Swiss-Prot record:
It catalyses: 2 nitric oxide + NADPH + 2 O2 = 2 nitrate + NADP(+) + H(+); 2 nitric oxide + NADH + 2 O2 = 2 nitrate + NAD(+) + H(+). NCBIfam families: PRK13289.1. Its EC number is 1.14.12.17. The record marks 86, 386 as: Influences the redox potential of the prosthetic heme and FAD groups. Residues 154-258 form the FAD-binding FR-type domain. Binds 1 heme b (iron(II)-protoporphyrin IX) group per subunit. Binds 1 FAD per subunit. Consists of two distinct domains; an N-terminal heme-containing oxygen-binding domain and a C-terminal reductase domain with binding sites for FAD and NAD(P)H. One of its GO terms (biological process) is cellular response to nitrosative stress. This is Flavohemoprotein. It comes from the Bacteria. Its cofactor is heme b; FAD.
Length: 397
């Protein structure tokens, strides 16, 4: 990834870094206010992340990081891939980018005032369209790859809930088949679906849920924890029945197993973060008989532990697969380790520096293990993780 920005453009962008550090969130708030004057544009965004401020904070941090690295945009390659995958999931298309450009530049002028000269705005316009064109090009490649496969689709597609499976006291799995009776594009184990819910009280609400079954052309399975409140998880748990229709876009995401497994694999999850791991384990059990796999999961207790019997069955089918569970509230009868997963335990019981780690779980879980694994000597390129919600600068680092 290389950019042909002039030295003058680079100087202008870098001159705004202190202002972005101070006023970045205000600029992004103003940008979204402008964008959301158009209801069709507003409907593209996850409003929950708008209301709690996480998206505003994350985007402000991303723009600041871009400004600081304007002379070395190659450091943003992984972010470009993650955002492109997310945009395909949210059905964002090339025609939406000019709206963002107008809103962003208008917000910069509104917040920075006279400091945002015509030269500064021109430089930021150039910087925006450089990134926007990278995203559009990558998104086009992703969509083409989906559409060339049997069962592929691009926009929102209607699925029928064909089965509900209680997995724990707070977690339920939902089997999904296309309403049109056609095939589905096989996902890569670890990817997710983006859903649009139009039930009463949450029009246009969007959520990402990892696919929790192995790749196939017939159906998907998602496994959802009942969260507090009245959002998508409450709708699925309390209102969605067998026969209920829900809409989603095709599987996307940059968190998945490689086509060729060259190193031992450690799957590490916390709570409902087990969902992409189950998908990976199903694929490994089916297609990678020689892969060496350690699955380590942490949860509160037996009542909160989802899919335990299914995971044990997968382990029994594969001669090189091991699974260990940690309960923070363990009883004497539980076949689990007591307490929390630790780096010392992983170092002693897995291949560690020789392994590829795949992580999914709550934000504190990920922040701790991404940082500590790398700090303990696992190469950063061997630490892969999935996080739902806007990625803050600390996580992205």
């Amino acid at each position: 990834m290389s950019a042909s920005f002039s030295p003058h453009t680079i100087t202008l962008i870098k001159s705004t870094v202190p202002l972005l550090a101070e006023h970045g969130t205000t600029i992004i708030e103003a940008m979204y206010h402008r964008l959301f004057e158009d209801p069709q544009i507003e409907a593209l965004f996850n409003q929950a992340n708008q209301k709690n401020g996480t998206q505003i904070h994350a985007l402000a941090g991303a723009i600041l990081a871009y400004a600081r690295n304007i002379d070395n945009p190659g450091v943003l390659a992984s972010a470009i891939e993650r955002i492109s995958q997310k945009h395909v999931g949210y059905a964002i298309h090339p025609e939406h980018y000019p709206h963002v450009a107008t809103a962003l530049l208008g917000a910069i002028k509104q917040v920075l005032g006279d400091v945002a000269t015509s030269e500064v705005l021109e430089a930021w316009g150039e910087a925006y369209w450089f990134i926007a064109n990278l995203l559009k090009d990558r998104e086009a490649v992703i969509r083409e790859g989906i559409m060339t496969k049997n069962g592929g689709w691009i926009h929102w597609r209607r699925f029928v809930i064909s089965k509900r499976i209680p997995e724990s006291e707070t977690i339920t799995s939902f089997m999904l088949h296309p309403e049109d009776g056609g095939p589905v594009v096989p996902h890569q184990a670890g990817q997710y679906l983006t859903f649009r819910f139009d039930a009463a009280g949450m029009p246009g609400m969007k959520r990402n849920y990892s696919i929790s079954c192995g790749p196939n052309s017939d159906h998907y399975r998602i496994t959802v924890k009942r969260e507090h409140g009245t959002g998508a998880s409450a709708f699925l748990h309390d209102q969605a029945k067998v026969g209920t229709i829900i809409e989603c876009t095709p599987p996307v995401g940059d968190f998945f197993l490689p086509s060729v497994i060259e190193r031992p694999i450690v799957l590490l999850s916390g709570g409902v973060g087990l969902t992409p791991m189950v998908s990976m384990m199903e694929q490994i059990a089916e297609a990678y008989p020689d892969a060496q796999v350690w699955y380590v999961h942490g949860t509160q207790n037996r009542e909160t532990h989802a899919m335990d019997a299914h995971i044990r069955a997968l382990v029994s089918r594969h001669k090189h697969m091991k699974a260990t569970t940690f309960y923070t509230q363990r009883s004497e009868a539980d076949d689990a380790e007591a307490g929390f997963i630790t780096i010392d335990w992983l170092r002693a019981n897995t291949p560690f520096q020789k392994a590829d780690f795949y992580l999914c779980g709550p934000r504190p879980f990920l922040r701790t293990f991404v940082r500590d694994l790398i700090g303990a000597g696992v190469p950063a390129a061997q630490v892969h993780y999935e996080f739902f919600g806007p990625m803050d600068e600390e996580m992205a680092a």
